């Protein structure tokens, strides 16, 4: 049975502290497991970076000062900026230099990546598997972003955040999530049902809740909640992009969970066909090679 911890804010007034029930947080639509509610907030520097990049009149000096305010965070950004993950040809030795060369959207992508790595902290094989899927999805988003008329950096940031709910559940409820993620299923919908059976919430809804709780941009919330939904005419362009990239990441060899009805690569790229015109879709082996090479940056 899933364990919970007492949230004193939700304790009935009539009960003394020592007899307080252990309860989850219940919203209008779903019950959120209380350990998920008690996860530490998203990295403060990354949150400020996300907020500042929405300001068209942003002061670049202020932007660099925010990042430089945490020397360890700034060092991690420079490490990734100089790594094979992003593949920039020139070495960058300071945050302001990096901002000048890379631009705000790429720095935002780097900041979110650093924050996500820090959020994971201790890693085991399943955390590693989930993280690789998130990064693979982000890299595929970047690769196919031009098809959707998005910048590669903006697409990458959306992709790397899409599974924050699964990572959050695994971090807060490892005992309950490990059997779910180690199982074999017919399809993704069966995985989501298994998560709900174990924790009363699936990772899609959990991710949407975390984004709102951390006051991150709302487009991330839509992506987290609906990236496993069937394509819909009302989907935003960014959501369509992430849906396609998530399936492509699974198809080229980076699934989180094994499913019998795993989409083939041709099935995964089929939503791109109307947008391609005379252009050719990227080859599966090329995508796999690129993602594998760039993922190596995280193992160094």
Residue ranges and their predicted role:
Residues 276-279, 283-299:
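C-terminal accessory extensions/subdomains outside the catalytic/core fold
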């Amino acid at each position: 049975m899933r364990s919970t911890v007492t949230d004193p804010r939700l304790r009935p007034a009539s009960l003394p502290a020592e007899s307080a029930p252990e309860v989850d947080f219940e919203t209008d639509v779903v019950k959120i497991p209380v350990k998920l509610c008690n996860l530490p907030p998203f990295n403060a520097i990354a949150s400020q970076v996300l907020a500042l990049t929405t300001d068209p009149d942003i002061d670049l000096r202020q932007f660099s000062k925010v990042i430089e305010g945490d020397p360890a965070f700034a060092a991690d950004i420079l490490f990734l900026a100089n790594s094979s993950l992003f593949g920039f040809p020139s070495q960058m030795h300071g945050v302001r230099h990096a901002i000048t060369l890379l631009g705000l959207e790429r720095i935002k992508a780097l900041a979110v990546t650093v924050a996500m790595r820090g959020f994971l902290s201790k890693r085991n094989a399943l955390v590693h598997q989930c993280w690789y899927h998130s990064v693979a999805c982000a890299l595929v988003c970047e690769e196919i972003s031009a098809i959707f008329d998005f910048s590669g950096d903006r697409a990458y940031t959306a992709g790397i955040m899409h599974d924050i709910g699964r990572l959050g559940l695994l971090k807060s409820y490892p005992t309950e999530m490990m059997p779910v993620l180690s199982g074999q299923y017919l399809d993704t919908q069966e995985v989501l049902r298994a998560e709900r059976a174990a924790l009363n919430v699936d990772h899609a809804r959990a991710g949407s809740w975390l984004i709102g709780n951390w006051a991150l941009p709302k487009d991330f919330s839509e992506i987290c909640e609906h990236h496993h939904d069937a394509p819909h005419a009302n989907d935003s362009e960014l959501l369509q992009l992430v849906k396609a990239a998530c399936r492509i990441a699974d198809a080229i060899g980076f699934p989180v969970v094994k499913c019998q009805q795993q989409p083939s690569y041709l099935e995964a790229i089929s939503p791109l066909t109307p947008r391609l015109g005379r252009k050719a879709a990227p080859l599966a082996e090329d995508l796999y090679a690129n993602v594998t090479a760039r993922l190596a940056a995280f193992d160094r």
